[in-house]
């Protein structure tokens, strides 16, 4: 897949990354090579491969969930923490919108 300078500029703009023309020129072939490699991965026959989430099996010991389980604070400090935030809504931190 071929990526041109304008495509790199658009991606950089969406990611809020400032790039010079020289950086855009350098990045276009690099992104093209990465996407070509991803296309090659898509061509690999994986029909006989068992799906997995990790190479090494993950066996984690589980515990019961406990409300207010924080040993340092005893829990129940959400309101105190949110009181220091510039914006909060429905028990969550409020942040400015960054997606256009």
UniProtKB/Swiss-Prot annotation:
Belongs to the GatC family. NCBIfam families: gatC (TIGR00135). It holds the Pfam family GatC. It catalyses: L-glutamyl-tRNA(Gln) + L-glutamine + ATP + H2O = L-glutaminyl-tRNA(Gln) + L-glutamate + ADP + phosphate + H(+); L-aspartyl-tRNA(Asn) + L-glutamine + ATP + H2O = L-asparaginyl-tRNA(Asn) + L-glutamate + ADP + phosphate + 2 H(+). Heterotrimer of A, B and C subunits. This is Aspartyl/glutamyl-tRNA(Asn/Gln) amidotransferase subunit C. The keyword NAD does not apply. Keywords: ATP-binding, Ligase, Nucleotide-binding, Protein biosynthesis. It comes from Erythrobacter litoralis (strain HTCC2594). Allows the formation of correctly charged Asn-tRNA(Asn) or Gln-tRNA(Gln) through the transamidation of misacylated Asp-tRNA(Asn) or Glu-tRNA(Gln) in organisms which lack either or both of asparaginyl-tRNA or glutaminyl-tRNA synthetases. The reaction takes place in the presence of glutamine and ATP through an activated phospho-Asp-tRNA(Asn) or phospho-Glu-tRNA(Gln).
């Amino acid at each position: 897949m071929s990526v041109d300078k304008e495509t790199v500029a658009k991606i950089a703009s969406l990611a809020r990354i400032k790039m010079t023309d020289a950086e855009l020129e350098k990045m276009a072939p690099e992104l093209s090579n990465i996407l070509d490699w991803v296309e090659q991965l898509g061509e690999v026959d994986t029909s006989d491969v068992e799906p997995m989430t990790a190479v090494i099996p993950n066996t984690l010991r589980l515990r019961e969930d406990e409300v207010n389980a924080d040993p340092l604070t005893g829990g129940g400090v959400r309101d105190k923490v949110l009181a220091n935030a510039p914006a909060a809504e429905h028990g969550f931190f409020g942040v400015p919108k960054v997606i256009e």
